[in-house]
């Protein structure tokens, strides 16, 4: 192995000192081991990505610790970045037994709003546009077991709707006690719980949402969802939903909306090859991401799975079918023994090909007593894309990514403005980590979309970056990874190219734009 993108530990220098509260007790409540996520987004509109951490709590805690928001104080051009804790003055000092986060401009006012999923309640924070948030009841609160969520304009009306993942039917009173060997208490696997249907909330114009799950064809109580990512799986211009379920078949919801009669979906995971792995059985799936990993212009889907179940790369075909090709592509066997929560498919080394990161960690602190070959803290895994459809190869990491972690949430963003993607990772019951990308200087292109007919955030935007001899395809989507939200911008490494011939843009509304020889080495603000 050789080091890929040279990540260094920037946690101490960043000033980020978040430690996740999991509320763990000898009782081993299921919720203790599942959280939590992280969101990277520019909350105050100063052009610098900030970081919000979702926090957990002890079951029944009367005053749960709030999540924490860290403001980016600058450090552009690759210099060290410092953050300051602004939780109290931001209006986000509200505690819950939190799980995941999603960000998006739901009212198209130019400011990114925040949704936080939790167990027993969800929270929505409206961005006031002055560096602060207000908690708002907009119809997004559900008493279930919240998981990953994604803002996505499913009906293409220009307003972001919300797909809220739901895990299992659970309460403290119904928590099951497990001891696989009859001696050591352990966290139960989800097979002992009933599933819970996900929710689709339709945006009614920026100030209210309505639950349209059933009428949209998304009611599926047999799912046990932990991850979700939007994508256009069948190339019809409408956003579909790939859903990672834990020990039940994965879902692929194809969008059958017509723009007139409301959202409509058809579940097609089995017939499209996305429901199961090569054995034909469901797996314990957690994190999920989408990217063109083979260079054919089609979105492939990466799914992180439980230990002793290889993580998956569902390779897309032009016919809209998927095939888990992880073993042939090089991600299968290296991921067999680890338990992958956070999953990202992004270009770490700036060569133009999306690579893969798996943030690993077991759910059971004493797993070694039950399975001697397993460990609670596990090494993250980085895979470099060899390009040209040749697959992925595992590479040695550096910094905190070379240490065993109890990994959960993983998000990417250009924290220091130098044109490559840095990583922020959460651990269950442990400190969060900031990994700064110190790749050698390379050409890059950034895109910050501002929708007009489309949703203002630009979720669903697709771009083709045309270079001499190759074309790079990227899409901007919410969801991704596990319980987390990456910076809602596009950062594209250009490899050895020193210029872009043209940038072809397709907006969610269907509007197309072409920019000839766009400037590189900077972020373009792109208006629809």
Regions found by a protein language model. Give the residues of each.
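Beta-propeller blade termini
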Residues: 35-45, 71-72, 97-108, 112, ...
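Hydrophobic beta-strand segments that make up the repeating blades of beta-propeller
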Residues: 48-55, 109-118, 162-166, 239-245, ...
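Repeat-based blade/solenoid architectures
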Residues: 16-37, 63, 90-102, 139-150, ...
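Beta-propeller blade signature
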Residues: 68-72, 196-203, 254, 315, ...
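Asp-box/WD-like beta-propeller blade repeats and closely related beta-sheet repeat scaffolds
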Residues: 86-103, 117-154, 164-191, 195-197, ...
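Blade-edge beta-strand/turn elements of extracellular beta-propeller
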Residues: 7-9, 80-91, 132-140, 207-219, ...
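Gly/Ser/Thr/Pro-enriched helix-cap/hinge segments flanking short amphipathic alpha-helices
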Residues: 3-6, 13-14, 24, 28, ...
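Short, conserved, GDST-rich strand-edge loop motifs in beta-rich repeat architectures
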Residues: 54-64, 166-193, 358-375
């Amino acid at each position: 192995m050789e080091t890929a993108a040279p990540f260094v530990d920037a946690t101490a220098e960043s000033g980020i000192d978040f430690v996740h509260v999991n509320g763990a007790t000898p009782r081993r409540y299921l919720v203790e081991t599942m959280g939590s996520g992280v969101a990277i987004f520019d909350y105050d509109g100063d052009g610098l990505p900030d970081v919000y951490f979702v926090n957990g709590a002890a079951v029944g805690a009367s005053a749960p610790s709030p999540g924490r928001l860290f403001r980016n104080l600058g450090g552009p051009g690759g210099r060290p970045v410092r953050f300051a804790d602004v939780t109290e003055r931001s209006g986000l000092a509200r505690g819950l037994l939190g799980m995941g986060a999603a960000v998006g401009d739901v009212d198209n006012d130019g400011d990114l709003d925040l949704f936080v999923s939790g167990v027993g309640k969800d929270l929505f924070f409206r961005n006031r546009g002055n560096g602060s948030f207000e908690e708002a009841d907009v119809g997004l609160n559900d008493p279930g077991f919240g998981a990953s969520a994604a803002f996505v304009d499913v009906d293409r009306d220009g307003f972001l709707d919300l797909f809220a993942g739901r895990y299992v039917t659970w309460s403290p009173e119904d928590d099951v006690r497990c001891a696989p060997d009859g001696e050591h208490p352990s966290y139960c696997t989800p097979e002992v719980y009933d599933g819970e249907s996900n929710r689709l909330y339709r945006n009614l114009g920026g100030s209210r949402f309505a639950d349209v799950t059933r009428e949209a064809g998304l009611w599926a109580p047999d799912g046990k969802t932990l991850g979700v990512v939007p994508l256009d799986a069948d190339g019809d211009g409408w956003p579909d939903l790939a859903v990672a379920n834990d020990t039940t078949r994965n879902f692929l919801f194809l969008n059958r909306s017509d723009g007139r009669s409301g959202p409509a979906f058809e579940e097609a995971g089995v017939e499209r090859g996305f429901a199961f792995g090569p054995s034909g059985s469901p797996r314990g799936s957690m994190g999920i991401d989408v990217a063109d990993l083979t260079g054919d212009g089609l979105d492939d889907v990466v799914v992180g799975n439980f230990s002793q179940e290889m993580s998956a790369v569902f390779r897309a075909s032009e016919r809209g079918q998927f095939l888990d090709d992880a073993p042939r592509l090089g991600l299968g066997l290296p991921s067999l023994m680890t338990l992958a929560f956070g999953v990202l498919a992004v270009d770490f080394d700036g060569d133009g090909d999306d690579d893969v990161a798996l943030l690993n960690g077991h759910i059971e602190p004493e797993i070694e007593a039950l399975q001697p070959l397993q460990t609670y803290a596990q090494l993250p895994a980085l895979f470099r894309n060899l390009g040209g459809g040749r697959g992925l190869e595992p590479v040695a990491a550096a910094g905190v990514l070379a240490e065993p972690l109890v990994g959960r949430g993983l998000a990417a963003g250009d924290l220091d403005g130098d044109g490559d993607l840095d990583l922020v990772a959460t651990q269950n019951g442990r400190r969060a980590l900031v990994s700064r990308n110190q790749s050698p200087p390379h050409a890059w292109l950034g895109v910050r979309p501002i929708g007009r007919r489309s949703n203002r955030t630009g979720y669903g935007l697709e771009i083709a970056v045309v270079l001499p001899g190759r074309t790079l395809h990227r899409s901007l989507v919410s969801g991704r990874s596990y319980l987390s939200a990456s910076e809602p911008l596009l950062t594209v490494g250009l490899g050895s190219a020193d210029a872009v011939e043209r940038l072809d843009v397709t907006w969610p509304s269907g509007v197309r734009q072409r920019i000839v020889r766009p400037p590189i080495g900077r972020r373009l603000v792109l208006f629809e």
